[in-house]
A protein has these predicted regions:
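Catalytic-core "active-site belt" of small-molecule-metabolizing enzymes
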Residues: 1-145, 149, 157-168
Length: 168
């Protein structure tokens, strides 16, 4: 749904991008997060996050925020360039508390509200590619290591954040 929302063609196979470890933030609940001052328009994208164990197996899951510098990403897309600069800034990979995954992930829901207003909501079962399909595809493309994180994509409803917004 997010790809359609962004005007992209539906994918027949997953696409991936990288975020540097320095982009990772694992803040305690209720804390304030600082966005880089030089960014004009940062969008929220709520996602399921997988943490990998030995042999690239799924060991834990969490809710995450993939923060995107939308203007820079749009420029990169138009020029056919990588998205690293738009996705890899400080605090652009915010991850909540990890838990042991339940049996089956399809019934889990992702929800995000900004200042109490619902913005994103969908079940994992509505994803174009299942989390395990993403993991399988990525493991064929790149070497995966214990501790690696895989953000699994976002539902429709992404949008900009303003300084002082409260995200739940």
């Amino acid at each position: 749904a997010h790809a359609k929302e962004m005007g992209a063609k539906p994918l027949t196979s997953p696409r991936f991008f990288l975020k540097p470890w320095a982009a990772l933030a694992e803040p305690p609940m209720g804390c304030e997060m600082m966005l880089p001052r030089h960014l004009d328009e940062v969008h929220h994208e709520v996602e399921l996050v997988l943490r990998l164990g030995e042999d690239a197996t799924l060991t834990e899951i969490a809710v995450g925020l993939d923060m995107t510098d939308r203007a820079t990403q749009d420029e990169a897309k138009a020029e056919g360039m990588p998205w690293t600069q738009s996705k890899g800034f400080a605090n652009s990979a915010i991850v909540g508390n990890f838990i042991e995954p339940p049996v089956g992930l399809a019934h889990l829901r992702l929800e995000l509200a900004v200042n109490g207003e619902p913005r994103q909501e969908a079940s994992i079962g509505q994803m174009l590619f299942t989390p395990l399909d993403l993991l399988s595809s990525l493991s064929q493309w790149a070497p995966l290591e214990k501790g690696d994180l895989l953000f699994c994509g976002t539902p429709s409803g992404i949008g900009p954040l303003a300084r002082g917004d409260h995200v739940q």
